[in-house]
């Protein structure tokens, strides 16, 4: 995380050793604990920031299950955040407070509540990092084994949060390959609601490690009280909400302990990933804006820098890489105003040339039959064509048909005494990042490229296989259950080494599409590939859901060819452009197959996107109409921090004769300002009625503007796709 680079201000505040309300505050919210020496630390409150009088009168809930970090053993029916087997075999643990302190870290403060077991030498620190400039609190736990022998951790949540029962709804994301980020809203009912991941390498294809709780009924986008929670972890996770016979829902989040019990050696400390918590009184979109601001400033690499408009080669040529073709694609994207060209899979392999997906991963040497002038030749072409150059790698993986596997079969994850289950191409395996030698190798893949070719500006880092074979050839027989955790500890070490040496390179996080859209992974990356499905219609749904937790600057959204290569739908070029312009704009197409008219439309759109790019990538998101509400359209908008500029998106989702769509009311504007309207990416023969006119923010938010359902174009160009992008500037 970026906080690792913030100088620690050496100020520690010790709190009194008596009953004490410990207040963890941001600018707009508070998390309150009751910490009394010799007693369990307890939750009092999480919500909007309390004034001193309300804080003084806050009472401790009498329910003993309000412990801030409940441990298993003495209240066995209760759900536990921590469970362990002590070195003598005892399964019971009790935790009482021993003190509290606060340290300032740049733009944040870290409150530590110290707990210990009165019988065993086990210490647990509850950590809370509160930011001064964004409403986000990160909660995590550190467990120290002071016993004489090894302690086995069987449950080790990052945090637990009690939520008062009522009409509480949960919003979360699910999906699969090519259909990531699907949004669901569900009322919490008695019982357990569990979201978990067991993939091993990628953790956001099927479910996401982030949720929102709407406290006033089914969530509204721009009104209502909402708790947002995101587990900042790249590996297997478990989010669990327990609703029993008490007055509370109990939300637990942390590493998925399934097949991952951890043997904590004497003197060793185990640190859980952080759970990022936010609170919004402005609905679901308000919680999203908090995540976006926090992510841009404290998690993403280069979260304050505009992203380049790029052309990626994958859907244009797939494995058919060659020097002349790459040069032509660079020239084409430059001619349309693009700034970066990325060469995808298929450029490497000598003994086993990468002409398909069944070989050569791990053999990161240029195939000179395809690229006789090598990477340097491509960089020369990029300079000639005045674009930056990027390259695809998949460094965590190998194929059985590779020189790497032939040399180091002991480097792969493989169950002993069993034939391996193979992945993509029938030959793919995952390298064991718990092994320091493998960590060195993976770091070396990037290091060798960037040392030899320092002008490489962008890396697309892919990961196309789960950990299918549980077995580490590096870890001891007794520590095989550490594999899932040790893999991601090793991964983090590699990314930290890369970022320490190569601070400026842009790195995209790709994993069979959107398999790594999570804040734990993004701590060293600039952006992620939302999905391998580039169909504009389905991207509206996926990007709407994904925007609940991730900002536009991190969401790679590309214009692709039709029929779409995944769902075979044919949409208009304008529609594809208008969807892609709502994220980090790029192209996933073979330009030589485009007509001059299509290139001209893209050239115009890219030029206009450059004008609105700061608003889209750094502005506040307001979701207006959900595609999931079956109203026949979807709409969002971005508003600059000063509320002097905004970009409004409107996409029609269904086409029926005599259809009646709602007029969309805008949000986030200054009601007292006048905004001049300009349509972007225009294809119509006549302007919109609102074109060039000015409206008050109050009018736009209370009444909105009518959008024509069809485009006014010549008969031969009519189709069933309609979309609008409006640029608003305050006068």
Regions found by a protein language model. Name each.
Residues 28, 211-213, 221, 627-671:
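Carbohydrate-binding surface patches
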Residues 28, 93-94, 262-281, 721-729:
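Short Pro-Gly-centered flexible turn/kink motifs
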């Amino acid at each position: 995380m970026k906080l690792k680079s913030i100088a620690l201000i050496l100020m520690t505040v010790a709190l009194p050793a008596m009953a004490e309300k410990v207040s963890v505050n941001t600018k707009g919210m508070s998390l309150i604990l009751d910490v009394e020496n010799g007693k369990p630390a307890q939750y009092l409150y999480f919500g909007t920031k309390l004034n001193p009088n309300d804080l003084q009168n806050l009472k401790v809930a009498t329910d003993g299950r309000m412990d801030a970090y409940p441990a298993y053993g003495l209240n066995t029916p209760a759900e536990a955040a921590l469970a362990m087997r002590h070195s003598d075999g005892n399964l019971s643990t009790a935790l009482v407070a021993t003190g509290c302190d606060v340290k300032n870290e740049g733009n944040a403060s870290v409150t530590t509540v110290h707990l210990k077991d009165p019988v065993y030498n086990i210490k647990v620190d509850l950590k809370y990092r509160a930011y001064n400039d964004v409403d986000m609190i990160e909660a995590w736990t550190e467990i120290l084994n002071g016993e004489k022998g090894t302690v086995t951790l069987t449950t080790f949540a990052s945090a637990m949060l009690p939520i008062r029962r009522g009409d509480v709804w949960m919003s979360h994301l699910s999906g699969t390959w090519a259909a990531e980020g699907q949004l669901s809203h569900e009322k919490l009912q008695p019982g357990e609601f569990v979201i978990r991941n067991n993939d091993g390498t990628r953790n956001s294809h099927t479910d996401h490690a982030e949720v929102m709780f709407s406290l006033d009924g089914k969530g509204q986008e721009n009104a209502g009280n909402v708790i947002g929670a995101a587990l900042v972890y790249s590996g297997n996770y478990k989010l669990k909400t327990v609703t029993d016979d008490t007055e509370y829902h109990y939300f637990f989040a942390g590493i998925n302990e399934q097949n991952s019990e951890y043997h904590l050696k004497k003197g060793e400390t185990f640190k859980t990933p952080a759970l990022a918590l936010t609170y919004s009184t402005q609905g679901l979109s308000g919680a999203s804006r908090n995540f976006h601001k926090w992510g841009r400033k404290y998690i993403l690499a280069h979260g304050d820098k505009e992203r380049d408009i790029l052309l990626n080669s994958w859907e244009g040529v797939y494995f058919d890489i060659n020097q002349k073709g790459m040069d032509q694609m660079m020239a084409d994207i430059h001619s349309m105003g693009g700034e970066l060209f990325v060469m995808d899979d298929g450029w490497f392999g000598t003994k086993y040339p990468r002409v398909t997906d069944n070989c050569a991963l791990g053999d990161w040497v240029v195939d000179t039959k395809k690229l006789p002038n090598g990477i340097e030749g491509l960089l020369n072409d990029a300079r000639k064509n005045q674009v930056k150059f990027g390259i695809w790698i998949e460094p965590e993986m190998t194929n059985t048909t590779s020189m790497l596997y032939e040399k180091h079969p002991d480097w792969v994850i493989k169950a002993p005494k069993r034939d391996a289950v193979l992945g993509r191409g029938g030959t793919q395996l995952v390298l064991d990042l718990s092994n320091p030698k493998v960590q060195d190798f993976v770091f070396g893949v990037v290091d060798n490229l960037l040392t030899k070719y320092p002008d490489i500006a962008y890396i697309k880092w892919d990961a196309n296989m789960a950990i299918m074979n549980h077995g580490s050839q590096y870890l001891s027989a007794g520590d095989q259950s550490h594999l899932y955790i040790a893999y991601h500890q090793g991964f983090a070490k590699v990314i930290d080494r890369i970022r320490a040496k190569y601070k400026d390179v842009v790195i995209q996080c790709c994993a069979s599409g959107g398999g790594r859209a999570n804040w734990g992974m993004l701590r060293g990356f600039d952006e992620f590939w939302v999905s391998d499905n580039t169909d504009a219609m389905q991207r509206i749904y996926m990007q709407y859901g994904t925007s609940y937790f991730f900002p536009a600057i991190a969401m790679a959204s590309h214009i692709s060819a039709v029929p779409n290569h995944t769902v075979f739908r044919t949409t208009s070029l304008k529609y594809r452009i208008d969807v892609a312009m709502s994220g980090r704009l790029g192209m996933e197409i073979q330009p030589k197959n485009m007509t001059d008219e299509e290139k001209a439309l893209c050239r115009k759109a890219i030029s206009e996107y450059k004008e609105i790019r700061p608003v889209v990538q750094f502005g506040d998101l307001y979701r207006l109409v959900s595609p999931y509400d079956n109203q026949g359209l979807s709409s969002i908008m971005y508003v600059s921090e000063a509320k002097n500029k905004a970009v409004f998106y409107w996409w029609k989702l269904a086409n029926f004769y005599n259809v009646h769509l709602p007029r969309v009311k805008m949000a986030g504007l200054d009601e007292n300002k006048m905004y001049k309207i300009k349509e972007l990416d225009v294809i119509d023969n006549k302007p919109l009625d609102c074109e060039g006119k000015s409206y008050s923010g109050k009018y736009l938010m209370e009444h909105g503007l009518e959008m024509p359902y069809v485009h006014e174009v010549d008969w031969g160009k009519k189709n069933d796709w309609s979309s609008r992008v409006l640029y608003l500037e305050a006068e």
